[in-house]
Amino acid sequence: MKLVNIGFGNMVVSSRIVAIISPDSAPIKRFLSDAKTRNELIDATYGRKTRAVLVLDSGHIVLSALHPETIAARIEGGDKEEESY
């Protein structure tokens, strides 16, 4: 199981991530609103601006303050911030 740091010490299992997308478009904002009403939204931004939306295979949505490119690099590159168990 490989964990990836999505900011502020929060970790997500990398194999469960289906997509990493930018939150700026109107369809994504509606998607986030729907997830919030279903109680499937996890906010890991610590009050910062949301810069990436992670869609998990369980249907949960995770908000991160890191850029999508940063998270993708951590998943692919084996950054120091991630841990393997």
Swiss-Prot record:
It comes from the Bacteria. InterPro entries: RemA-like. HAMAP family: RemA. Belongs to the RemA family. This is Putative regulatory protein DICTH_1339. It comes from Dictyoglomus thermophilum (strain ATCC 35947 / DSM 3960 / H-6-12).
